[in-house]
């Protein structure tokens, strides 16, 4: 098949979060299976856009802020619309990694006008919102999203939220977890790693980097040899993080800036523990990346895949408080055998549930119009589906156009 994937923004600092890495991983696996795949996006970086990301062909335009002050959702380039029109003329299926943003709106509109089969994937970015700018945007956006052949969601919880947004006239909602290609296993027996704990995410209030710094302070009180690093682009929380670091003991916590994918992989591989402090995380792609690198994970009980990981012994799940996360980190740093067991369990869960091969199998089925209709009902393994359904004020994976 000739496939066109569209994602809002690809950048060298990862500011748009998980959707670009998911789009690249899916595109690479589909291309390896013989499909003709192109990825189209805006580009923001210190240099010109690459022609390829790994094995994936990239067509891009420089990101321009058409709606100033709206972050990634207000980005577009006028010529990207022309590029979309031309590219869809030869596509069998268009896969839009869709948020409430101008690029997604343009891609869905062009697919509708050109009558190209379209699959949307919302990545936790389309949730019920009542703010006036969102309601105005949705007057254009939702009718286009309802025309998709299918809409892919991460978990049962996200399926219920998207169903509330789209209503009874929405497309079939298909659960599609994120996937990753596991790296080579570590030699046995697993060698203990230095007591280095990492945070890899945007520095955004929902990601709770300040809670990570507070957790680090508590761990350091009992384990003074431990060191902590936050990696990721600033999305509003860096000033508060720097202030907390400066107020704490010198040399214990540092901010390492944004990482490219290769640097992030090395950060996972060298860390003793990865901590995802986020609340109401729709999925938690960094968790899967850490597990694939053989790194034990601590996460909160509102992470979308927390129950699955806990059931398989692949993560320590906490209540999200700095005290709870600190206790979990101390437990891992003090027990090399537990770390080794969790590393093995993490690799198994990636291979069994979150492999990119299984995701591509599912995508091929969806592209061909098959698969089980999942418009309604429960399912999924997410704790958030039970505890947070309908909770007001939840944040999507990337900023939405709310004031």
Question: Model-flagged regions — what are they?
Answer:
Residues 88, 258, 266-271:
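Short alpha-helical donor nucleotide-sugar binding micro-motif in glycosyltransferases
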Residues 157, 179:
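Carbohydrate-associated surface elements
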Residues 239-262:
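Nucleotide-activated donor-binding/catalytic signature segment of Leloir-type glycosyltransferases, i.e.
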Residues 296-300:
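Short hydrophobic beta-strand element within catalytic cores of glycosyltransferases
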Residues 279:
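Aromatic "clamp/platform" in nucleotide-sugar-dependent glycosyltransferases that forms part
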Residues 311, 315-323, 331-336:
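Conserved acidic donor-binding segment of nucleotide-sugar-dependent glycosyltransferases
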Residues 4, 188-217, 229:
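Conserved donor-binding/catalytic core segment of Leloir-type glycosyltransferases
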Residues 200, 227-241, 257:
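Glycosyltransferase donor-sugar binding loop
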């Amino acid at each position: 098949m000739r496939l066109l994937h569209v994602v809002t923004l690809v950048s060298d600092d990862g500011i748009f979060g998980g959707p670009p890495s998911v789009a690249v991983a899916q595109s690479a696996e589909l291309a390896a299976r013989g499909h003709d795949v192109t990825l189209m996006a805006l580009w923001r970086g210190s240099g010109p856009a690459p022609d390829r990301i790994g094995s994936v062909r990239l067509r891009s335009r420089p990101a321009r802020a058409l709606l100033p002050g709206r972050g990634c959702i207000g980005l577009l380039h006028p010529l990207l619309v022309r590029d979309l029109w031309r590219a869809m003329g030869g596509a069998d299926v268009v896969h839009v990694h869709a948020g409430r943003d101008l690029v997604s709106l343009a891609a869905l509109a062009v697919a509708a006008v050109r009558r190209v089969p379209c699959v949307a994937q919302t990545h936790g970015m389309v949730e019920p919102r009542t703010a006036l700018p969102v309601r105005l945007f949705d007057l254009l956006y939702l009718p286009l999203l309802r025309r998709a052949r299918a809409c892919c969601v991460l978990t049962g919880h996200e399926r219920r939220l998207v169903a509330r947004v789209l209503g009874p006239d929405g497309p079939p909602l298909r659960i599609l977890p994120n996937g990753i290609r596991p790296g080579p296993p570590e030699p046995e027996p697993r060698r203990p790693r230095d007591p280095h704990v990492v945070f890899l995410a945007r520095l955004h209030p929902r990601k709770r980097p300040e809670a990570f710094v507070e957790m680090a302070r508590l761990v350091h009180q009992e384990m003074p040899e431990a060191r902590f690093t936050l990696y990721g682009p600033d999305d509003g929380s860096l000033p508060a993080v720097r202030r907390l670091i400066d107020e704490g003991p010198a040399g214990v916590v540092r901010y390492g800036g944004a990482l490219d994918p290769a640097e992030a992989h090395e950060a996972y591989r060298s860390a003793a523990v990865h901590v995802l402090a986020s609340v109401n995380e729709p999925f938690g792609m960094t968790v899967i990346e850490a597990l694939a690198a053989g790194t034990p994970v601590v996460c909160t009980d509102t992470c979308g895949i927390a129950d699955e990981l806990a059931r398989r012994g692949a993560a320590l799940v906490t209540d999200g408080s700095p005290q709870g996360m600190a206790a979990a980190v101390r437990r891992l740093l003090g027990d090399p055998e537990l770390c080794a067991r969790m590393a093995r369990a993490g690799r198994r869960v990636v291979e069994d549930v979150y492999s990119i091969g299984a995701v591509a199998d599912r995508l091929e089925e969806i592209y061909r119009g098959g698969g089980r209709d999942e418009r309604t009902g429960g399912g999924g393994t997410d704790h958030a589906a039970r505890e947070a359904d309908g909770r007001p004020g939840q944040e999507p994976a990337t900023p939405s156009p709310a004031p």
